């Protein structure tokens, strides 16, 4: 679980407006932060299949949000990908 201070910082960095917490950009950024925090856990605990299911669910949700954003506004999609460093 990410700390509330880190979560607030991620929201502030990716918000489109002052109180924006629900835009696809913010949701993708929060999921990315959670995924990046969980990744080292699975390097150490390779047999944690129950936790891995949750991780894969987060990755799938992020993928769907990115697909939605790409369909709605490709410029915002490319800016977000570059900002978060998701695509190689």
UniProtKB/Swiss-Prot annotation:
A GO CC annotation given for this chain: cytosolic small ribosomal subunit
Keyword terms: Ribonucleoprotein, Ribosomal protein, RNA-binding, rRNA-binding
Gene3D superfamilies per record: 6.10.250.3130, S15/NS1, RNA-binding (1.10.287.10)
SUPFAM superfamilies, alphabetized: S15/NS1 RNA-binding domain
Family annotation (PROSITE patterns): RIBOSOMAL_S15 (PS00362)
Listed GO MF terms: rRNA binding; structural constituent of ribosome
Pfam family, one: Ribosomal_S15
Disulfide bonding pattern of the chain: none
Family: Belongs to the universal ribosomal protein uS15 family.
Its biological purpose: One of the primary rRNA binding proteins, it binds directly to 16S rRNA where it helps nucleate assembly of the platform of the 30S subunit by binding and bridging several RNA helices of the 16S rRNA. Forms an intersubunit bridge (bridge B4) with the 23S rRNA of the 50S subunit in the ribosome.
Quaternary organization: Part of the 30S ribosomal subunit. Forms a bridge to the 50S subunit in the 70S ribosome, contacting the 23S rRNA.
UniProt-recorded name of the protein: Small ribosomal subunit protein uS15
Organism of this sequence: Paracidovorax citrulli (strain AAC00-1) (Acidovorax citrulli)
């Amino acid at each position: 679980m990410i700390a509330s201070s880190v979560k607030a910082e991620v929201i502030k960095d990716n918000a489109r407006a002052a109180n924006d917490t629900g835009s696809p950009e913010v949701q993708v950024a929060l999921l990315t932060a959670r995924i990046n925090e969980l990744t080292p856990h699975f390097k150490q605990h390779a047999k944690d299949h129950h936790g891995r299911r949750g991780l894969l669910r987060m990755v799938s949700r992020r993928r769907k949000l990115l697909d939605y954003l790409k369909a709605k506004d490709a410029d915002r999609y490319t800016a977000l990908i570059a900002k978060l460093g998701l695509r190689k």
